[in-house]
Amino acid sequence: MVDMAIFKATYTTTATSAKASIRYIAHRRGKDNAKVTRALWGWDGKMERREAYQMVDEAERGSIFFRFVISPDPATEDTRRDLFLREITEQTMLGLEDRLRRQIQWVAATHDDHAPHRHVHVLAILPKKLQVHDLKALRHIATEAALQQRYQRDNALEQAQEHGKEQPQWELHH
């Protein structure tokens, strides 16, 4: 069995709980219980907490507020703790939009300071509950994005190392 990215999902139907989730992802205490404020971000880059709250307040009636955690496998995907988690998150959320055939609003924060596995918390506003097959598809999308990025980063590192070894050899001959 191939290790896969961890993709957890829970949901709420209340704006109050959604806002509590935003506070949590922005202000969860860091390592050694240190107070930390993390940047919130979405499709358009950095987002202020008041903007995230406004997004929740303006959600269509009946919206479902999904909380996702996207965490590349540290043993096979984020082996060097160097993956661009924002890119993986954006690819995953784009996959969700494709499945739902509509744009969705979401806010995220990267948590890379309090656990051995780096991860991203996302609060997404959806028109309906997701089914098990949707969640499995999102996990697959996150895994593929992480593995592809791992391959590209390892390839680039390998080429840089080879180039670095060849360069002194070339200099010796000229």
Regions found by a protein language model. Give the residues of each.
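N-terminal nicking endonuclease/strand-transfer module with a His-rich metal-binding environment
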Residues: 1-174
